[in-house]
Amino acid sequence: QRQMCIRDSISTDEVFGSLGKEGSFNEETSYDPRSPYSASKAASDHLVRAWNETYKLPTVITNCSNNFGPYQFPEKLIPVSILKLMRGEKVPIYGDGENIRDWLFVEDHVNALLQVAEKGRISETYCIGGHGEMTNKKIVYEICKIMDKIYIDNSPHSRLIYFVEDRPGHD
């Protein structure tokens, strides 16, 4: 049993910038934040490292990909798509929908955090991903296919997809 309390700064993979069509982020990837949100998370990571270096605060940093699962905030991509499709409402996709996300089930994220808490080394950074890279467009179309099987009367659900102007700083 560990005798000390470790401070885990749960960060985001957005600190690394946009995920390309090939490859993935790892602990050696340079920071390249593209939005105020990701810049603030990168700054937080650097602050945690400084506290570790200066005051020997026992810390680790975990950078995780996009979580999904039960009780997720309803404005996030997967739940908002499901809820809107259930109500027969249009589902917006930002830009061309080609933004790639790595999707991680929330229970898998929790299990990874427990592993880091039990076996992680002080001052290290751990990337936690689901190896489920998919474009936003693809995930919404996949949700539509599932909804077509469940709510047959409202098929095809893909007719409810529309594209809107991309948000500033959206990676």
Stretch-by-stretch model annotation:
Residues 14, 66, 133:
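PG/GG-rich flexible active-site loop of Rossmann-like NAD(P)H-dependent oxidoreductases
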Residues 79, 85-171:
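C-terminal substrate-binding subdomain of Rossmann-fold SDR/epimerase-dehydratase oxidoreductases
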Residues 1-2, 12, 21, 77, ...:
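Activation loop
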Residues 15-61, 68, 72-74:
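Catalytic helix-loop patch of NAD(P)-dependent Rossmann-fold dehydrogenases
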Residues 8, 17-21, 56, 72, ...:
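Proline-centered turn/helix-capping motifs that create local helix->coil transitions or kinks
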Residues 43, 47, 51, 81, ...:
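Hydrophobic alpha-helix immediately C-terminal to the catalytic Tyr-X-X-X-Lys motif of short-chain
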